[in-house]
Amino acid sequence: MSEEIHLSVDAMGGDFGPRLCVEAAASFIAKHSNVRITLVGDKAAVSSCIPPQADLSRLHVLHADQVVDMADKPSHALRHKKNSSMWRALQLVADGEAQACVSGGNTGALMAIGCHLLKTIAGIDRPAIAKQIPTARGSSVLLDLGANLECSPQQLFQFGLMGQGLARVYGKSEPTVALLNVGSELTKGNDIIQDTAQLMGDCADMHFRGFVEGDSLYSGEVDVVVCDGFIGNVALKVSEGVAKFVFGDLRSRIGRGVRSRLLAWLAKPVLKPWAEQFRPAKYNGAALLGLKGVVIKSHGGADAEGFEQALYVALEQASAGIPLKIQASLAAMLGAGLETK
């Protein structure tokens, strides 16, 4: 990653305003000498958050008068928020001035403005939110995580193609794909799931492995798991909630008495790396796959460490040229007519 990468950041997005975004950006450029960041937002508010030790030669502020609120409808943001921090951060990518954009703001607006400014890759109807999730065998790609609450079989099929392309970039030479369903039997699922399975199964360029159930999501049985945005977002939020409950309950039990604290001290060499593996901040940052540019969605409630991880995902995907690789992969398959088996 020696080539300079320019990242744009919607500094006004997220639940906590610019402070955490700016803190994360300053920390990130200190660790990555090939990165410069443009923080987009209210200049006075953003500038006041920049720590005195920050490298100002690689950390810039671009003023934007408006903010896309979490309550804004995507259509409203498209019509009335053209001078917002989100719009201007995405515009930098569209103009070729930045290689990636990171925002913790309104997901629907981010997708709508992203589609308007960056456009979608040929052969893709709508982008999907995708991210790597930890599994028993390393990691898998899960999509869609909330960009499209309802999907046609053709769109779900396209998600599978994009997820497969992303998995290849992450080192899976022949990634396997499955649909998230209410059962693993071939007869399970509604008409949309059944029709999607038919499309995937008939595609010689896709290593389709049928269905996976929710309890197998983290097994690592397949490399790519596809679902609509409603199901994907619920699955992700439930997973986050379970993780918080388990770790919270474990902490409370460890603190109950001398014996528990002693056992915790003895088990620390095992518990510490185990807990580290499943920290939410470690997996923050999901890509809007299908756009002609790298756009990373950070969790709105992420802390500075989590936002810094989203910046790393942006750097990683910009350096790897993810959109171009997915576009080339899709073009090759579409050019071959997506041969059937």
UniProtKB/Swiss-Prot annotation:
It catalyses: a fatty acyl-[ACP] + phosphate = an acyl phosphate + holo-[ACP]. This is Phosphate acyltransferase. Pathway: Lipid metabolism; phospholipid metabolism. Catalyzes the reversible formation of acyl-phosphate (acyl-PO(4)) from acyl-[acyl-carrier-protein] (acyl-ACP). This enzyme utilizes acyl-ACP as fatty acyl donor, but not acyl-CoA. Homodimer. Probably interacts with PlsY. It is an enzyme of class 2 (transferase). It is found in: Cytoplasm. Belongs to the PlsX family. Its EC number is 2.3.1.274. It holds the Pfam family FA_synthesis. PANTHER family: FATTY ACID/PHOSPHOLIPID SYNTHESIS PROTEIN PLSX, PHOSPHATE ACYLTRANSFERASE. GO terms for cellular component: cytoplasm.
